[in-house]
Structures are given as structure tokens and as C-alpha cells.
Amino acid sequence: MAAAPQARETVARESGFKTNPDYKILFERSPRRVRVEFNGETIADSTAAHLLFETRHLPVYYFPRADVRMDLMTPTDHHTFCPYKGTAAYWTLKVGERTAENAVWGYPQPFEEVAAIGDFVAFYWDRVDHWYEEDEEIFVHPRDPYKRIDAIQSSRLVQIVVGGEIVAETRRARFLFETRLPTRYYIPPEDVRMDLLVPSDKTTACPYKGRARYYSVKIGDQVYQDLVWSYPDPIAECPKIKGLLCFFNEHVDEIRVDGKVVPKPVTPWSKDWQDKAKTVPDQRGPVARP
């Protein structure tokens, strides 16, 4: 999830940078006009919004207070402490009859290492209604301008094994390379055992690719839930994967490329990663969509 303030006791006041100097926070102005809407009202509209990049977190938009409808927000008694930014103050948003409690936060007196954020506020993404960059709506979280996605056609033989059976085999896959994520293999439906796929009600959204729908794989009496996804209408920046099918590397028996088994990655969708995150929360990376 994004780097919103973490609820914790506010007893410590010393900057975490003193004990963890390798921790990174970058606060960078965005050249895009960014807007936020709630209950039909524009509550933030700025050409001076900043992206905050933070170790192990997704980017977050911060807005100058001058570009935010602070008159629609009421300070609350809620506070949280971040060892790298300081103590966060919160505001409840109210427009008409709708209220979003503690939906807005800021650091009025941040640590000196991040002093620039002091006159800015941020919004919990899912507590407001709509986000826009220029005139296009964006979803899930801000897109990272330093992230790259390449979908490249390959004639290498790709085989997907589930439940001991080859459920997909192709020399027409598109290999999707995405910064800091495992390679994904998008396969034409003609090269997938579609008779084994059962449409699922699950959908997810990715800010870089669009909205995905899912399929489960049924082999005999065994159902492998939500193992496959597809983007029927990807966003304009990612057209090459339209209608292709992709299997979770983490959960199939094997993915073979030219006969060689691809090592299973440890990602936010892996059981090993999830187990580790329960015991060492700070090791968790950002949860993006596959």
C-alpha cells in the first residue's frame, strides 16, 4: 500500500535517518495538473503537486495547502508518528452530507531531512472519489515516472504447467518486463486450454495497464482460484497485451521458457512473501497489481 502514515505510539521523536541513513525519501514536483474530487466537488486542483517517493512504498501525491479546499476540512485529534517524516496531523473531509473521517494528513512540523513537506497535505486514495492527471482519470495510486513497462513479442517456447498438465503452450507470447517485478508471460487465448478456464468475479485495477479480469483453472475436481488474468481494454499506453492471458508465476506448477523452468519469484503475491510480511512488516515492498 502507499506510504500513508503508520499508526503507532508517538513517544519517539528522533528522526529515523540517524539510525537508518540508507532510508530514502525523495520529494519531487510533478509537471502534471492533478485534481481530486469528492462528492462532486473538486477538493484539490494543483499544478504544483509533488510526488513523495519513499523506500518500500508506492509514490504519494502531496498538495500545497493553497491548492486544497481546506475550508471543507476539519482538524481532528488523531495523530500518527512516522520515524522518517515526523508526527502527522489529520483532517476530516465533509462535502454536503458525505464525510470522510481522517482522510487527509500532513506533517506541520516534519523532521528537517524532509522539511519541504511541511506546507503540503495528502489524501488517502480510496477515501475520495476521483483522481485526475490533466483530464484523464487515474486509478489505484500515482504512476511512478521512473517505472518502465515493455511488452515484447517473443518466439521462445513458453509452457505453463498447472496440476501436472500443460495448460498453455505458445511461441507467440509477449514478455512483459516491468520495473522491480517478475517477467510476466501474456499468451494468446488460442494457445491456452480455454476449456480449463472458468471466468471469475474478481477484478483488479493497475495504474499502468488498466482493469484486469480473472479466470480460475479447473483440472478434474481441483480448482486453482484466480490464477489467470487478462486486460480486455488496457489503457492506451499498454495496448500490446490486450486480450492476452497471463498466469501467476508464483502459483502455477511451472513456467518453462525454451524447456527451462523459470524460478518462482518471491513477490507480494507469494505465500512465502506474505508469511514473511507477517513477522517482519518493514520488509514488505509496495503492493502493485500484476
Q: What would you call each of these model-derived segments?
A:
Residues 1-290:
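Terminal leader/tail segments of proteins
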